[in-house]
């Protein structure tokens, strides 16, 4: 199972790929330029690990709190991928997780 976690709600654009029990991540500056090329950042990131968008099993996107523009952009990209490739997506919010030690990106699929 290949899960992709996207968080553009904060100071960095954070991408995490959970591929067959292995965890890979990358972060980028959260700027207008990177908002405009979020799809390219995602494509390049998963391509690094020999995956295509269609091979992603589930998508997870941070729905806040944080930058409205970042949330709007990342949610739009995730919805587009979901519709085009028929991949389920889930929104998460770290504030909903409660217990501090669970607030890790790698726990998002378990907690959602």
Residues covered by each model-derived region:
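Conserved phosphate-binding catalytic cores of ATP/NTP-utilizing and phosphoryl-transfer enzymes
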Residues: 92-110
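Stable alpha-helical structural segments in soluble proteins, enriched in small hydrophobic residues
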Residues: 45-49, 78, 84, 101-103
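Short glycine-/acidic-enriched loop or helix-start segments at secondary-structure transitions
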Residues: 15, 70-71, 101
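N-terminal beta-alpha supersecondary unit
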Residues: 1-58
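Short beta-strand segments
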Residues: 5-7, 62, 111-112
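DPxDG-like acidic metal-binding loop motif
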Residues: 58-63, 68-89
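Anionic group-transfer/hydrolysis microenvironments
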Residues: 9, 64, 95
């Amino acid at each position: 199972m290949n899960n992709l976690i996207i968080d553009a709600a904060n100071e960095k654009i954070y991408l995490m790929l959970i591929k067959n029990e292995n965890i890979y991540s990358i972060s980028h500056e959260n700027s207008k330029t990177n908002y405009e090329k979020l799809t390219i950042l995602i494509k390049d990131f998963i391509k690094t690990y020999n995956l295509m968008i269609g091979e992603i099993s589930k998508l997870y996107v941070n729905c806040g709190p944080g930058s409205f523009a970042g949330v709007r952009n990342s949610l739009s990209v995730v919805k587009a991928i979901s519709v085009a490739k028929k991949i389920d997506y889930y929104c998460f919010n770290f504030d909903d997780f409660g217990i501090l030690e669970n607030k890790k990106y790698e726990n998002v699929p378990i907690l959602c």
